[in-house]
Amino acid sequence: MQKKEVFPVTGLGCAACAARVSKVLNAQPGVIEANVNYASATAMVCYDTDKCTPESLGKAVADSGYGLITAVENEEDAAEKERLKQYRALKWQTVGAVVGTVPVFVLSMFFMDLRWGQWVAFVLSATVVFVFGSRFHINAWRQLGNRAVNMDTLVACSTGVAWMFSTFNLLFPGFWLSRGIEPHLYFEAASVIIAFILLGRLMEAKAKHKTNKAIRTLMDLRPKMVTIVSQDGTEKEVPVQWAHAGDTVVVRPGERVAVDGTVFSGASYVDESMLSGEPVPVMKQSGDKVFAGTINQKGAFRIKADKTGQDTVLAQIIRMVQDAQGSKAPVQNMVDKVASVFVPVIMGIAVTVFLAWLVFAPEDGFTHGLLAMITVLIIACPCALGLATPTALIVGIGKGASNGILIKDATSLEVARNIDMVILDKTGTVTEGRPEVTDCLWASGTGDGDRMVLSGLERLSEHPLAEAVVRFLGMECQVEISGFENIPGRGVLGMSEGRRYLAGSLELLRSEGIEVDTAMLKEAGRWQNEARTVVWFADQDRSLAVLAVTDRIKPTSAEAVEKLRGMGIRTYMLTGDNEAAAAAVARMAGIDEFRAGVLPQDKARFVKECQDAGYKVAMVGDGINDSAALAQADLSIAMGRGSDIAMDTAMVTILSSDLSRVPEAVRLSHMTVRTIRQNLFWAFIYNVIAVPVAAGILYPVNGFLLNPMIGGAAMAFSSVSVVANSLRLRSRKL
């Protein structure tokens, strides 16, 4: 059986580390696909449970020098504890390195001519490099044992070479003096490099933690405890993991609902803003559904648990956001390839630079070559490359989730950016999707039995018009409906007591050869001219009733259409409704083009026609009659109240069913993709310029040779700048 899980990863020091762990995981038997996200320090693994287990994956990762948190009930809590532990250790190492580096720097500036000053600098720098900077040397040694290299290898090599060269010169100054070379000491360079890099990593860790704020906010919505009623009637508060489907759960005033369930006792207003984005609490009473993470207001009620733990709607949303944040943008595959070879290539360049200085500048080639080699090793930064895409994705997708816009993956963002046509389904998308029956005309000779049959037929349908009819009739169905059949775009059929009944459009009745009452037909025509939808009811012989249904336009529909038009995006409305009703809705929503009387299969066909005409099409619907069109579109957007088939098909889900979120989703895609490109440009251009300058390319022109300390500072802040640029998305207005 295939299973997809997200595991926290520990010990990642750079993008090369993430590439290494990803390679290890993908090499394990049973692993179908594994992606390691350096920015979020997580691994998304799809694996065959018959061939491998989380424990075996954890062992493989541990053998490669890293950690994978598995087999923990609250993985996120364990990961957060580990993150805090590592952050505190990094913080104290940084403070220690800075405190130790300051006197070394002062000694090198003013007291290096004095022998005691050199020895004090030797002791202090050894403490900074090998005690406070021990993480670099330990990790580099561990990677060497696994025949791998990473960013820590570059830091360990550069600072280690600088410190050992300085120590040799301190102990044996005559070796170089006898050859006419001044024995320089670089204790301050090694110390400052360690201090700068630790400071940079501390800032990076803090910034990366901010990028994950959205997913942590969602996780914080999950209650830790739940009150369950036992079989003997006593109430007991237990960890939420102990709750199971079928349990009776008590929800008191001010508490968060811990499970998805159905109210059967009591009533209260519930704040569902975390799901719908609507700030107004919703009244919940017997028979109503409530969801985990929502907040009960002043009343109290009891619910029968339907879904618990990882099956709740909130858990599904968290999982969807995690999957999206862990997905890879198309450009990321190229970045990963660069990151995987970056460190060995830089080490090769550094050695080549050293040799080139020896060959082409024999007088002071050794000293300058050594400095250039150290600077090349220290200034090159795969971290900026590794952070460029995932940090922007994490912040962008997290911002979407905070605004009720769930994005399936990174590819969906890329597609949304190129959309130039949005096709809107009318019912439930442009309109409220809660139609109300305003008028009803029954044929002579009909009675409660016919009304029960109509109610029974419509109860079996999931169309919003059917719900309106059931609410209008307001009676329990006491007749049995057999042979139920749904004819998409036309209506429903069924049998009761040996007679055949139909409910739906006039076309359905006529296709079945049923006689239509003239008076009803005239009244239906009048309703249609008033932009109302008409529902017919008939038996196998004649029309029995005709109902007029009105569905109000959402308050934000016209504004959303106007925003899309301002982006240069063409809008089109499709509906199975009559021409007059469709024209009225299109006019009020500001939609220029529409097509009425469209069957579900015609919607998908129309999307294909638009694509053939060169448009990049987004289809927006609720999944009731448009799942085929959603699947056909370049970008599928499902309104949150739709059926499960729409959620599975959709690349973007709007939780609140608010159409204004559609232009916001498009704008979010533009901002996120633009940020990714800015980050990648900076990361690449930084390395393209920094490495040659560090190698000494400017020396023949103006005698400039970059100081290794400046190189360390530049490297440290290059990755911080990428994360900071991504964090700008959080404050941008959609």
Language model features: what each stretch is:
Residues 212, 441-489, 510-525:
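ATP-binding catalytic core of ATPases
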Residues 110-113, 145, 164, 399, ...:
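Membrane-embedded alpha-helical bundles of multi-pass transporters
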